[in-house]
């Protein structure tokens, strides 16, 4: 029957078709077997490789943190030595005569100030560099951790979509 240019047929999209169900199931099983044979290994390999990369990043972050702490300790020692040296210069300046006292004290103060400011600048630079490296590593780890958490919280449909996407990416990279 034809009504306003639209053909109305008996039955509809929601009527079950046993032949279609059978062939859909057969096709699904075949695709599943093909994926298991050819894609499962690369997917697991990629996941293991990612796990190793994450562990390596964590180890590098710990190493960077340890190096930063060592650099901070070293810089504190340098600052302490610079302060001690400045005090020594001041004491030696006081031992000289009244005539030379003003010149020596002035030199000692300027040298001490230069050394302290230089040491402080060096400490600040090292501290900023170490903190930047640590922030970058922590940010990378946080992103990777968030990715893992998100991957763990996906439902079955989203996981299938991600697996399909990964398979397509793998096939693109192979070709």
From Swiss-Prot:
What UniProt keywords apply to this chain's record, in alphabetical order? Answer: ATP synthesis, Cell inner membrane, Cell membrane, CF(0), Hydrogen ion transport, Ion transport, Membrane, Transmembrane, Transmembrane helix, Transport
GO molecular function per UniProt: proton-transporting ATP synthase activity, rotational mechanism; proton-transporting ATPase activity, rotational mechanism
Transmembrane annotation, as ranges: 20-40
Q: How does it sit in the membrane?
A: Single-pass membrane protein
Entry annotated with the keyword Transmembrane helix: yes
Subcellular localization is given as: Cell inner membrane
Name where it mostly resides. membrane
Highest taxon of the lineage: Bacteria
Q: What InterPro entries does the record point to? A: ATP_synth_B-like_membr_sf, ATP_synth_b/b'su_bac/chlpt, ATP_synth_F0_bsu_bac, ATP_synthase_B_chain
Q: What SUPFAM superfamilies does its record include?
A: F1F0 ATP synthase subunit B, membrane domain
- A Pfam family annotated for this UniProt entry: ATP-synt_B
Provide the disulphide bond pattern: none
Which GO cellular component terms, listed alphabetically, does the Swiss-Prot or TrEMBL entry include?
A: plasma membrane; proton-transporting ATP synthase complex
Explain the purpose of this protein.
F(1)F(0) ATP synthase produces ATP from ADP in the presence of a proton or sodium gradient. F-type ATPases consist of two structural domains, F(1) containing the extramembraneous catalytic core and F(0) containing the membrane proton channel, linked together by a central stalk and a peripheral stalk. During catalysis, ATP synthesis in the catalytic domain of F(1) is coupled via a rotary mechanism of the central stalk subunits to proton translocation. Component of the F(0) channel, it forms part of the peripheral stalk, linking F(1) to F(0).
Family to which the UniProt record says this protein belongs: Belongs to the ATPase B chain family.
The record's subunit annotation is: F-type ATPases have 2 components, F(1) - the catalytic core - and F(0) - the membrane proton channel. F(1) has five subunits: alpha(3), beta(3), gamma(1), delta(1), epsilon(1). F(0) has four main subunits: a(1), b(2) and c(10-14). The alpha and beta chains form an alternating ring which encloses part of the gamma chain. F(1) is attached to F(0) by a central stalk formed by the gamma and epsilon chains, while a peripheral stalk is formed by the delta and b chains.
Q: What is this protein called?
A: ATP synthase subunit b 2
Query: What is the species listed in this Swiss-Prot or TrEMBL entry?
Result: Prosthecochloris aestuarii (strain DSM 271 / SK 413)
């Amino acid at each position: 029957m034809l009504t306003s240019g639209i053909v109305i047929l008996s039955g509809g999209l929601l009527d079950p078709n046993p032949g279609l169900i059978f062939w859909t199931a057969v096709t699904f099983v075949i695709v599943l077997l093909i994926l298991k044979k050819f894609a499962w290994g690369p997917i697991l390999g990629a996941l293991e490789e990612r796990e190793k990369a994450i562990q390596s990043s964590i180890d590098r972050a710990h190493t960077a943190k340890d190096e930063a702490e060592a650099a901070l300790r070293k810089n504190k020692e340098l600052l302490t030595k610079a302060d001690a040296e400045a005090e020594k210069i001041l004491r030696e300046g006081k031992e000289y005569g009244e005539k030379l006292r003003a010149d020596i004290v002035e030199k000692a103060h300027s040298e001490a100030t230069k050394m302290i400011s230089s040491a402080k600048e060096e400490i600040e630079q090292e501290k900023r560099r170490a903190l930047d490296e640590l922030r970058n590593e922590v940010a990378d780890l946080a992103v990777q951790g968030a990715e893992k958490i998100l991957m763990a919280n996906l439902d079955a449909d989203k996981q299938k979509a991600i697996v399909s996407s990964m398979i397509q990416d793998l096939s693109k990279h192979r070709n």
